[in-house]
Amino acid sequence: MLTPEDKAAIVAEYATSEGDTGSPEVQVALLTHRITYLTEHFKSHIHDNHSRTGLLRLVSRRRKLLDYLHKKNAQRYFDLIKKLGLRK
């Protein structure tokens, strides 16, 4: 799970300015970390369908934020997906 120390490290790495916690980059990075955690969780808990629904919501929210960022600033979008190792 995401500890406060992990969250602070992710926020510090992806923040666009001091104290930035709401930029799309930070939000996408936090969602990506949670998605990765849940993906690993499903390798040992195959029948956890309730959490799978939550995973689909997280993926959808991340997709919407990435679409927003691509529409507003394509260069920041491409830098972020490259840094996170997402597929595009």
UniProtKB/Swiss-Prot annotation:
The keyword Cell cycle does not apply. It holds the Pfam family Ribosomal_S15. Keywords: Ribonucleoprotein, Ribosomal protein, RNA-binding, rRNA-binding. GO terms for molecular function: rRNA binding; structural constituent of ribosome. NCBIfam families: S15_bact. HAMAP family: Ribosomal_uS15_B. Belongs to the universal ribosomal protein uS15 family. PANTHER family: RIBOSOMAL PROTEIN S15, BACTERIAL AND ORGANELLAR (PTHR23321), SMALL RIBOSOMAL SUBUNIT PROTEIN US15M (PTHR23321:SF26). One of the primary rRNA binding proteins, it binds directly to 16S rRNA where it helps nucleate assembly of the platform of the 30S subunit by binding and bridging several RNA helices of the 16S rRNA. Forms an intersubunit bridge (bridge B4) with the 23S rRNA of the 50S subunit in the ribosome. This is Small ribosomal subunit protein uS15. It comes from Hydrogenovibrio crunogenus (strain DSM 25203 / XCL-2). The lineage of its organism: Bacteria, Pseudomonadati, Pseudomonadota, Gammaproteobacteria, Thiotrichales.
